[in-house]
Amino acid sequence: MGLMWGLFSVIIASAAQLSLGFAASHLPPMTHLWDFIAALLAFGLDARILLLGLQGYLLSVFCWYKTLHKLALSKAYALLSMSYVLVWIASMVLPGWEGTFSLKALLGVACIMSGLMLIFLPTTKQRY
């Protein structure tokens, strides 16, 4: 059950990160404070996506709380690295994100996935 909560947390946090990235690229920069506030108060699509991303992070924290009650800390924190993989893949697949493929990034993803497999491999009981 802890693994399920952990995966929910990672998926929701990844979606929230993508939402916040979209909002940040479409809203005025915060250095233009009055334009930024006006865009938020207009509550257009960009502001709604920003709010959705923030709510996603809040929901992700709840799932993470449940994860930490059910799953060993060493395994739970390893799951967080999945977010890097999901966001990288989504940035290449989703239109408008302009994520780029590189062998260096693919090698990084392979390292992350290999590490996760090592951490989550079932342990064999040693006989003494």
Swiss-Prot record:
Q: Per the record, what ranges lie on the membrane's Cytoplasmic side? A: 1-2, 54-76, 122-128
Q: What is this protein called?
A: Probable 4-amino-4-deoxy-L-arabinose-phosphoundecaprenol flippase subunit ArnF
Question: What this chain does, per the record?
Answer: Translocates 4-amino-4-deoxy-L-arabinose-phosphoundecaprenol (alpha-L-Ara4N-phosphoundecaprenol) from the cytoplasmic to the periplasmic side of the inner membrane.
Q: Name one GO biological process term.
A: lipid A biosynthetic process
Any one Gene Ontology molecular-function term assigned to this protein's record: carbohydrate derivative transmembrane transporter activity
Question: Does the record bear Ribonucleoprotein in its keywords?
Answer: no
Task: Supply the alphabetized keyword list.
Answer: Cell inner membrane, Cell membrane, Lipid A biosynthesis, Lipid biosynthesis, Lipid metabolism, Lipopolysaccharide biosynthesis, Membrane, Transmembrane, Transmembrane helix, Transport
NCBIfam families noted in UniProt: PRK02971.1-2
Question: Where does this one sit in the cell?
Answer: Cell inner membrane
Q: Which sequence ranges are marked TM in the entry?
A: 3-23, 33-53, 77-97, 101-121
Cellular component annotations (GO), alphabetically ordered: plasma membrane
Task: List the HAMAP family.
Answer: Flippase_ArnF (MF_00538)
PANTHER family documented for this protein: 4-AMINO-4-DEOXY-L-ARABINOSE-PHOSPHOUNDECAPRENOL FLIPPASE SUBUNIT ARNF-RELATED, SMR FAMILY PROTON-DEPENDENT DRUG EFFLUX TRANSPORTER SUGE
Per the record, the similarity remark reads: Belongs to the ArnF family.
**What Gene3D superfamilies would the database entry show?**
1.10.3730.20
Lineage of producing organism: Bacteria, Pseudomonadati, Pseudomonadota, Gammaproteobacteria, Enterobacterales
Give the record's subunit note.
Answer: Heterodimer of ArnE and ArnF.
Membrane topology value: Multi-pass membrane protein
Q: In which pathway does it act?
A: Bacterial outer membrane biogenesis; lipopolysaccharide biosynthesis
Q: Which InterPro entries match?
A: Flippase_ArnF, Small_drug/metabolite_transptr
